[in-house]
Amino acid sequence: MFSREENELLTRVGPGTAMGNLMRRYWIPALLSEEIPLPDCPPVRVRLLSEDLIAFRDSNGRVGLLDEHCSHRGTSLFYGRNEECGLRCIYHGWKYDVEGHVLDTPAEPADSDFKKKLRHTAYPCREVAGIVFTYMGPREKMPLFPAYEWVNLPDNRMHVVKAYLECNYLQGIEGDFDSSHTTFLHCSNLADLARLNRDGAPTLEAEASDYGMRAISIRQLGPDKSYVRISPFIMPAFSIVPGPATAKFEENDSRAFRFWIPIDDTSTWFYILTMRDTPFSAQERASARSWVDSRYFRIRNAGNNYLQDREHQKTRSYSGINAVIPAEQDGCATESMGPIYDRTQEHLGYSDKTIIALRRVLLQAAKSVQEGREPPHLVTDPKLNDFSRLRAVKGVLPANGSWRELPDLEEGMV
């Protein structure tokens, strides 16, 4: 049973918490590049790990992520003037650069060196794949940015979207490692009862790795073959899932790198970075965003009961939620648990094997930071910074075959 103390440890992410301190040791998404599209464009509010921040793009195109409140007397920098390579507070004109240096204090005497004694809270940023990443931990411990597959992928072979979730991040990411739910929640054809009977209870395995963990699910396709999916969990709250298999389990080369980023304890930004080996069309890109509005709120949400169609539920789909992508159905399942689910009330079975393993990995990592030890997957050696082969893997094997025999199981998965 998951204890109340363990639940608190994994779900609280503010400054000074065990999980919050852990997440701050990694490069994590802060916002999409498109939210601050041009030099000197209006700044935007960013709430991240229970901290209120302001993101802006300066005159040279550099991105800054600052504490929202001016170091002078606390006025919000959201209303500031973004000009001449800095963000200037509208109250007394204090001006900050992207690194938090105080460039100007015009209300102070001309000969004052007051500004040289100050440093506003600012977090380093890096833009990759249409996402602004930030590092919020100790500067002296800042790791290298991990060189995942998408770091050097052409823009036309990937697209990214984010969505707002009204629940704790852990509820969301646990769904990525709950293989058995896909048979039911995402079933779009009730007539396919054979499929429900065939793969409702997959064989599950979990294996620790230097980057976190990988989850393995094995479904029997008959007496002589099985379908295998291997999904990595990557510290601190990332996952990779393969593209959906067709009804005939044909190949689909798409894969999605997913980030579950806490806004605070009870809300989450969910980023989906989708990749494949051929370019995406403009129509495909538009469709991939059609389930969120201009603020990245989901069209189907708790306020409209996820637009569930009860008649459709009776006759067609298992959930009655006619989603553009499965994540919309996942949102209903995870948000309806409440803001932070009390895991002391759950009753876990075999189908939760990989979720239990995921929690164990996170607990060990959080406790490592509590005890002053380094958590896993902090990249510090440039020679070891190559994760381009780290992917989700899927394939069909003989019934008695091992998942380790999959041809795409590269060194990066180890």
Language-model segments: which ranges?
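C-terminal catalytic domain of Rieske-type non-heme iron oxygenases
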Residues: 15, 37-38, 62, 133, ...
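Short beta-strand or tight-loop elements
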Residues: 26, 49-51, 121, 211, ...
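A short, structural micro-pattern
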Residues: 24, 119, 126-128, 254, ...
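A boundary/linker detector
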Residues: 1-24
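Generic N-terminal leader segments that precede the first folded domain
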Residues: 28-30
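Rieske [2Fe-2S] iron-sulfur-binding domain
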Residues: 16, 32-159, 201-203, 340, ...
